[in-house]
Regions:
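Amphipathic alpha-helical segment used for protein-protein interaction
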Residues: 50, 128-181, 188
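Short, small-hydrophobic-rich alpha-helical interface motif
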Residues: 31, 50, 54, 71-79, ...
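Amphipathic, Lys/Arg- and hydrophobic-enriched alpha-helical face
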Residues: 43-66, 81-85, 169, 214, ...
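DNA-recognition helix of helix-turn-helix
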Residues: 107, 165, 176, 182-185, ...
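Arg/Lys-rich amphipathic alpha helix in sigma70-family domain 2
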Residues: 85, 100-125, 129-137, 158
């Protein structure tokens, strides 16, 4: 039976479309002033991004015990509670801060379930391993598609680009989303992806090609709009 990798169906219901840099800056300023509604909107923008990253850190055994969306909800609650501790002023600094909270949540959850689990689950996972895994997945997400040719005065930062691409990834049908996460973000070979998804290696290759084409089309529609 196929093993689903994507952030479960709750992510598909989240608002799609990523805000402009100016809008994020405005919401950061309002949230810092203590306004709760802008803070909620701000965090919601990064739900899909964080869910994608969380899903890359859970193998099929841990996914039986941990839900990516539950981990992200815990991350959002911590970010909402501790927002006054955020010292950055830019979208990329906010993304980095949220990612660090997610890393702490992931490490705690994985350590708890590894300790409670059987021998077939990794016994020990260091915080450095989680940091490395999340950072690698974030970089891979940002580089899935070629960057737009923006002017030097308006660079697309890696973190912001990754968050925007996660919104488009969330719009894909589940098997497309799964195969892109497994191949592009986790870097698994097709034979291993085939085992994860319960399909032949050839079928997985064709699925991945179709998924990438659809992903490009989805992203291009925003670029052209």
């Amino acid at each position: 039976m196929a093993t689903m990798v994507s952030a479960d169906s709750s992510s598909a219901g989240k608002k799609s479309g990523f805000p402009s840099r100016d809008e994020v800056l405005r919401l950061i300023e309002q949230a810092r002033a203590g306004q709760t509604e802008p803070l909620g909107q701000l965090l919601e923008f990064y739900f899909n991004y964080l869910t994608v990253l969380a899903s890359t850190q859970l193998d099929h055994r841990l996914r039986k015990r941990l839900s990516p969306s539950d981990l992200v909800q815990e991350t959002m609650m911590a970010a909402h509670r501790d927002f006054q501790a955020f010292r950055g002023n830019s979208p990329q600094e906010l993304v980095g801060w949220l990612r660090q909270i997610l890393i702490n949540v992931l490490h705690g959850a994985i350590a708890k379930h590894v300790k409670a689990g059987k021998r077939d689950i990794r016994r020990e996972v260091s915080i450095d391993q989680v940091v490395s895994g999340v950072d690698r997945s974030a970089a891979n997400l940002a580089s899935i598609l070629p960057g737009r040719q923006d002017s030097p005065s308006s660079p697309i930062h890696c973190e912001e680009r990754a968050a925007s691409l996660a919104e488009h990834l969330a719009q894909l049908r589940p098997d497309y989303r799964d195969v892109i996460i497994l191949r592009n973000l986790k870097g698994l070979p097709f034979d291993e992806i085939a085992e994860e998804m319960g399909r032949s290696s050839g079928a997985v290759r064709m699925l991945w090609l179709r998924a990438i084409d659809k992903f490009k089309d989805t992203f291009q529609m925003e670029v052209d709009s």
